[in-house]
Design a protein with these regions (language model features):
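Short aromatic/basic micro-patch
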Residues: 53, 96, 128, 201, ...
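ATP/adenylate-binding site constellation spanning eukaryotic-like Ser/Thr protein kinases
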Residues: 41, 77, 99-102, 123, ...
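Cyclic nucleotide-binding regulatory domains
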Residues: 35, 44, 60-123
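Residues that scaffold the ATP/ADP-binding catalytic core of kinase and kinase-like folds
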Residues: 83, 105-106, 136-137, 179, ...
Length: 250
């Protein structure tokens, strides 16, 4: 069962390939309101002058926790997992980041080190920006300054959600329900009727590490959610039919 489940997630990661990065950010079909890259056309043009584009295969390391943060990265396509912990010990998945996410912003602004490690779950395209070039870009554009503040606030909200999921949810079902809702909000899409849909990118083992339980318990709990009609998992996609039910578990 575990091998089949891992194979299914691997297929999903291969299926959800990131789109090719467009010639210009303004032409990118992935952009959404509220993302850092959803800036005015003139500001975007200046951003492109200080960035390049890189591609990562699946399961490739982008940066490691504790490294000097010399660059930040805008995700144009694909998905990465962020982990924290001691390198010689167990790693905890902090969250999954997708298109529109900015990685390493706080570390770059504070002239510090990366607080997490980043590894691609799928092939991904990114725009790296060197620290000094990004700081110079911010000094020239107040719109970008405000967007950077908004991104920092979003990172704080993600960290608070992570802490609440582990510390405040008393049952595994409540913690897993919170995790599904977080994934839906971070990498999913809204559906008519109030539901959400997002790609299944994590194995049950990985989800278990995020909710402090075992893989078997995650499998059993997801099965109960499906039996109750709260979620469905089909064609490598998770659909939350009744997110309010998951929320009520907390």
């Amino acid at each position: 069962m575990a091998d089949a489940e891992i194979a299914g997630v691997t297929h999903t990661r291969q299926k959800h390939l990131s789109r090719q990065v467009p010639v210009g950010c303004a032409a990118c079909a992935n952009r959404r309101p509220g993302w850092f890259c959803s800036l005015g056309s003139a500001v975007l043009a200046d951003l492109e002058l200080v960035t390049s584009t890189i591609s990562l295969p699946a399961q490739a390391s982008l940066f490691t926790q504790g490294e000097d943060a010399k660059c930040l990265y805008l995700i144009c396509g694909g998905y990465l997992k962020l982990t924290a912990g001691r390198l010689e010990d167990r790693q905890m998945i902090v969250r999954v980041a997708g298109p529109g996410s900015m990685l390493g912003l706080y570390a770059v602004l504070s002239h510090g080190v990366y607080e997490v490690s980043a590894e691609s779950l799928t092939p991904a395209q990114l725009r790296p920006v060197e620290r000094e070039r990004f700081l110079g870009f911010l000094r020239s554009h107040k719109e970008a300054q405000m967007r950077a503040v908004q991104c920092i606030c979003q990172e704080y909200r993600f960290a608070l959600q992570d802490a609440c999921r582990v510390a405040l949810a008393e049952t595994v079902a409540a913690r897993l329900g919170r995790l599904l809702l977080e994934l839906a909000n971070q990498i999913g899409e809204h559906l008519n009727g109030g539901g959400f849909r997002f790609p299944l990118l994590l194995t049950h083992e990985e989800m278990a590490s995020m909710v402090c339980t075992t893989r078997e318990t995650v499998t059993r709990t997801l099965g109960q959610f499906r039996k109750d009609g709260w979620i469905s998992i089909e064609d490598s996609l998770v659909t939350l039919h009744q997110p309010d039910r998951l929320q009520s578990l907390a």
